[in-house]
Amino acid sequence: MTHISTHRPRIAVIGGGIAGLTVAASLLRAGIECTVYEQATVFADAGAGIQLAPNSARILHRLGLAGALERRATRAHAIETRRWRDGAPLARTELGASCVERYGAPYYLIQRADLHRSLLELLPPGVVRHSAACTAAEERPDGVTLRFADGTSEEAGVVVGADGIHSALRNTLVGDRPRFSGHTVHRGLVAADRLPSLFEVPKVLFWLGPNGHVTSYPIARHGLVHFSAVITSPEWDPEVWSAPSRPEEAAAAFAGWNSDVAELIGAAEGTHHWALFDRDCVGGWSTGRMTLAGDAAHPMVPYLSQGANQAIEDAWVLADLLGAADVDPGPALRRYEELRLPRVREVHRRSRERGHEFHLPDGPRQRLRDRSMPTAERLDDYAWLYGFEAAPVGSR
């Protein structure tokens, strides 16, 4: 059993999503007491899928989740990219055993709720407090006062804001606003037995076309296939982040695409329409007693499928540094930002660029992209991403 130190300041984690629970699990593994404050009364059973690349899967294995992932996730055998109209293959990246051999962990496909449940199982009872919506944090030299929506307050020695792109703590530390990417996405789930020819072997499928793309993959043992159908949408009400939609709306946006795309979207029982926001990847989110993690620190568009993966890296690095720190957490928090900022800036930049490349209209630039893809999508070319080792101190 991990020994919990009584000499370090107690840490408050704001937000009980993937980022917050991974921060908590990593801190507890490092012997640091923490409490997670979650605004929801109960955790929702969210249906969306997550791609867990080897850079985060290795960390989850170290946290003790290898068995849970093998039970609840699916190992992807490949990533395939196809043309929008005729489904012609553009590239195929082999994963499977090659991925494990090259990067030390599989490439997992999992339902978000299953990953969340697995992380929650790592935490002792009482670590997560529900109905605790943090609205403000006031830092002093000797601690932080947290203010909650119900009028109550709590004291903590260190605060980690892992409360997503709407982060209240980020508003205090940075003060910027989310940026609409110009893209929206229809997400849905389909029974896998409706699409037997597409997913006989578990894989991630992309279809690229003018002003849009579709991503799809099976998620774990549920017999379901997740899809995200992204379209260029220059206008969106900034006050509305998501809304229920109908599969017919998504199908209309992809009229004329390959029959596999039409079949995939048409087989969904329901869809949800989301606007995709990010922020510019700036620093300044760590002080002497407060910092951010995950989307609160560096929200990014999902075109490298790295949002959750980068949050998991954040959690491991932060806990590693705090575990090696003395009573004063300030140097560790500032070092955490120094280490993470170059990494997330690169992932953030490449994610934005990939979104533009995915949506090229048919023409010379699209043809150049397509010709280059078979050599640009090799497994070794992802060493910068999947091979990154997020362990600055190595104390664990």
UniProtKB/Swiss-Prot annotation:
Its EC number is 1.14.13.249. Part of a gene cluster involved in the biosynthesis of thioplatencin (ThioPTN) and platencin (PTN), potent and selective inhibitors of bacterial and mammalian fatty acid synthases. Catalyzes the hydroxylation of 3-amino-4-hydroxybenzoate (3,4-AHBA) to 3-amino-2,4-dihydroxybenzoate (3,2,4-ADHBA). Keywords: Antibiotic biosynthesis, FAD, Flavoprotein, Monooxygenase, NADP, Oxidoreductase. GO terms for molecular function: FAD binding; monooxygenase activity. FAD binds at A19, E38, Q39, R112, D295. Pfam families: FAD_binding_3. InterPro entries: FAD-bd, FAD-dep_Monooxygenase_BioMet, FAD/NAD-bd_sf. Binds 1 FAD molecule per subunit. It is an enzyme of class 1 (oxidoreductase). Pathway: Antibiotic biosynthesis. The lineage of its organism: Bacteria, Bacillati, Actinomycetota, Actinomycetes, Kitasatosporales. This is 3-amino-4-hydroxybenzoate 2-monooxygenase PtnB3. GO terms for biological process: antibiotic biosynthetic process. Its cofactor is FAD. It catalyses: 3-amino-4-hydroxybenzoate + NADPH + O2 + H(+) = 3-amino-2,4-dihydroxybenzoate + NADP(+) + H2O. Belongs to the 6-hydroxynicotinate 3-monooxygenase family. It comes from the Bacteria. The active site is at Y217.
